[in-house]
């Protein structure tokens, strides 16, 4: 009897203070929603970073640099690294060390909605081969010595919408999109890849 009266009293009290009750419930729901969003974002970042790296690949950057974009290594330094003992070799016994160049460019979004930052990776067939998650899904590889790029699948969607055959303007020249690649949802899918020497000439 007392339990029934207490429960009835609680219900009446909640109804009498329905505004406070509603705000409390909404506040708790908002906290749960934000917490769930943070967890989902953290998991997404973890999967992206895990897919981008590899246990048997080492990235060498300049002392004090935190990212590839902010690093600078000379050709001579890269050559010295390539002859260090203990590096993986191919079937001919040549070092599998690969020198790459990385630049950050601005590309216009569709509909005139400003620009987006995009990473351009100057690499080679050997560099692509060191990342087994990268697979060409349409078009072809860029030709060494040509102003050609292949584009990550992530850049073909959304507001950039880069498509096979498009002409991109950066580095004081035009570049033709000759291929589209996937990379198992890793960070590489948000990059453009081109011939390293051509990228270095365009941004020297």
Task: List where the protein language model places each region.
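Hydrophobic, regular-secondary-structure patches
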Residues: 29, 33-119, 138-140, 145
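Alpha-helical membrane and juxtamembrane elements of multi-pass inner-membrane transport
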Residues: 4-8, 23, 39, 43, ...
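Membrane-interface junctions
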Residues: 16-17, 51, 183
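Hydrophobic secondary-structure segments that place a key small or acidic residue at a functional site
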Residues: 98-104, 116-126, 132-198
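Short, small-residue-enriched loops and turns at beta-alpha junctions
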Residues: 22, 67-68, 185
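N-terminal Sec/SRP start-transfer signal
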Residues: 1-33
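Hydrophobic alpha-helical segments typical of transmembrane helices
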Residues: 10, 45, 77, 195-198
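Glycine- and charge-enriched low-complexity intrinsically disordered segments
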Residues: 199-204
